[in-house]
Amino acid sequence: MFYFPITPRLQRLYASKATARHMTWHADHEMDGDTMCHPSDSPAWKRFSELHSEFADEGRNIRLGLCSDGFQPFTNFGQQYSSWPVILTPYNLPPGMCMKDEFMFLTVLVPGPRNPKHLMDIFLQPLIAELNQLWECGVQTYDVHKRQNFQLKAALMWTINDFPAYSMLSGWSTAGRKACPYCMENTDAFTLDKSGKQSWFDCHRKFLPPNHQFRRNVTDFRKGKREVGKRFAGVRTGDELLAEIDRLGFKKAFEPGAKVTNALLSKDHGWNKKSIFWDLPYWRTNVIRHNLDVMHIEKNVFDNIFNTVLNVPGKTKDHAKSREELNDICDRPGLAKDPATGRFPKAMYALDRDSKRVLLEWIQKIKFPDGYASNLSRCVDLKGLKMHGMKSHDCHVFMQRLLPIALRELLPKNVWEPLTELSIFFRELTSTSLSQEDLNRMETEIPKILCKLERIFPPSFFDSMEHLPVHLPYEAMMAGPVTNKGRVEGSVSSGYLQEEIAKFASYYFAEGDPMLPVRLGRNETCDMDIDEDADRLGIFKPKGKPLRGSGRRYLEDDEIIAARTYVLLNCSEIEDY
């Protein structure tokens, strides 16, 4: 493995004026009403400050977030090889800085070729030891902004991971019926007889208000089942979880006999080990310790919706096994097998061939603003009537911006509406600022949205990814608008170190020095010409550079109107009017 100590890099943040003056932003800024724009506005951050006041009193002490994810560096060569970087991010910086590449510090690089799984803790031992040292003793650091030495300390606030990595770091198994780390043993998930898969169908009525009509419905959910009086058990504290792990006898992955002991205990419990993060003395007091990765959940939800609506063979959740047991679970005779033909009828949420072609041809023609999204037309397969090769950001854009428009004329209103509500939910949840009022509303609305979807889609549609959104508002409420995890894909130790050295050295240049790095916009170059004509509107001063060969054509009337509108909306000179 490769380990890059975090302490010297945290000290370097105070060695340059470009960063040192921003390191107390979290303590100096004032929250705008009940709107959270940074993790420091969150209840989890404030609770940590209350419990550890000595640490919080020094605003220069650093609070960190950790993320880890695997990647395949040799996918183009067909070789199975998985590497796992572990990245730390300081949250002291303002929102516009803390998620930039130069402030995402690669600390551990676990080599392949295999996924380390629950043995990940073995590779995290030096990091946890260093974090304990930074918490208990700290390190003397020179603050170039205040021109004084101080004892720098650091604390890990939480981790942010996709679902498989969540299990590796937290010790809670994210596979099987107890996969949800919030419901835990109190889950209502069940195993489908035909496919053997776990289903979270009809697991969301307990989150509804006590008098909601869905709770008494015995036809649209599981047959004859009411959810009267049942409620979500609530989120357990770190002290409660640690006490349970110790009572059951789980061991850390690197302790003697851990493999056999943990394997036996995990057969009857949701835990698979005692996480190494419990070695941090403050970890049990953290309000939230492991965050779900919203982008990962959103992508999986989108894939399930889109593949089911397009009825993609092998990927749709509405397959023969699902239909065979559908009416054993819920009352939907209209989707039962036709005894005369032996076939299952088309569901109202599935598109016919003509509608699929209309949808995919529309996607091929979509044009986005430069840098907004990738070219989705490359993902369209008109021959197979499906989409392929969509990345997480492609799914993110499609789910939040295109899905309601794309399906509005193609699906019945009772199907389109809850899908649109789910799209709006993800759009609001991933906004850069969140108000308490909006989060309370989202926490109330998401169970209703999921229940509406349960009245439409089959039980096989609802895997753990369709269930997890019900817990996302709570995480956002506790931790604030935590930006999506960073990923240093394809980085190797030598190349990463060279890049980090170059970035850090650049911060030693004086302010105003032309060699200080400036992030240019897309399609900009250092030698871009600027027209200094005072009478010319600001939007026309930069001289454009063509991206490809030139041509000539006349604009249509609607194109002229669109161009004029864009200019009027983006000229600072006319804002007063």
Regions picked out by a protein language model, each given a short descriptive name:
Residues 81-89, 103-106, 124-129, 196-203, ...:
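Amphipathic alpha-helical scaffolding segments
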Residues 75-79, 120, 168-169, 193:
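A short acidic (Asp/Glu
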